């Protein structure tokens, strides 16, 4: 059954985000009500250094089915933005992709660590930078079809140098590039990492909306 969402321009003011106000409600509130699924059984089948995997038995209405679920503590991803509108990205080898990828700096949250603290820590550890300002731009699920990992995206400005502190298995190259060039690399297919594409596009959209289409000095 298809449910038609209301037109943004008619039903309410536009807001660049997953949920947007529509007469005091969100767009998702207009979709037909669906019963909350219930987990009736869950078995852990793998425990790793970063994540665990369970097989969950789920009841949704009259249907009962199983899903493999990756349990992950969540991550912070950062776009470090300099006054000349360049951003700092990292080039690193990703074995599942069997190639080097250009990515926004990011990392898994440590035990009981807030996303903002995690973002500040990763920025300093990976790039050797400290941010005078960390602004939360968005939060999103990475791959909700099988993984519960959530990412928090921060825009880092008012940057100053600190000391890089990489883990033994972290071999990265820091790449400084203009935001406009990074956006062109997305269009050309040269940036292939989903979180980085999301982060750069949301950063560009945020800056343009605040400055009448022009990238600001920060």
Language model features by range: what are they?
Residues 6-11:
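Compositionally biased, intrinsically disordered low-complexity segments enriched in Pro/Arg/Gln/His
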Residues 14, 19-33:
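Short, Lys/Arg-enriched N-terminal segments with co-localized hydrophobic residues
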Residues 30-47:
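Extreme N-terminal tail/first-helix region
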Residues 31, 100, 144, 152, ...:
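Nudix hydrolase/Nudix homology domain
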Residues 36, 70-72, 76-121, 138, ...:
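Conserved Nudix-box catalytic region and its N-terminal flanking loop in Nudix hydrolases
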Residues 42-77, 83:
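Acidic, metal-coordinating catalytic segment for phosphate/diphosphate chemistry
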Residues 130-137:
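A short coil-to-beta-strand element that immediately follows conserved catalytic motifs
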């Amino acid at each position: 059954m298809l449910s038609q969402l209301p037109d943004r321009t008619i039903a309410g003011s536009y807001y660049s985000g997953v949920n947007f106000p529509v007469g005091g409600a969100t767009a998702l509130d207009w979709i037909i009500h669906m019963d909350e699924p219930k987990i009736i059984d869950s078995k852990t089948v793998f425990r790793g250094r970063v994540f665990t995997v369970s097989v969950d038995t789920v009841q949704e209405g009259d249907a009962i089915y199983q899903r493999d679920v990756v349990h992950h503590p969540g991550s912070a991803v950062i776009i470090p933005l300099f006054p000349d509108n360049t951003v700092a990205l990292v080039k690193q080898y990703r074995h599942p992709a069997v190639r080097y990828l250009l990515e926004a700096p990011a990392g898994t949250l440590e035990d009981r660590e807030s996303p903002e603290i995690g973002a500040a820590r990763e920025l300093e550890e990976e790039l050797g930078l400290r941010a005078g300002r960390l602004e939360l731009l968005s939060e999103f699920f990475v791959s909700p079809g099988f993984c519960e990992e959530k990412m928090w995206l921060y825009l880092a400005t008012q940057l100053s140098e600190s000391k890089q502190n990489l883990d033994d298995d972290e071999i990265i190259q820091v790449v400084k590039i203009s935001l406009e060039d990074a956006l062109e690399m997305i269009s050309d297919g040269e940036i292939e990492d989903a979180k980085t594409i999301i982060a750069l596009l949301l950063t560009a959209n945020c800056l343009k909306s605040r400055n009448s289409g022009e990238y600001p000095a920060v």
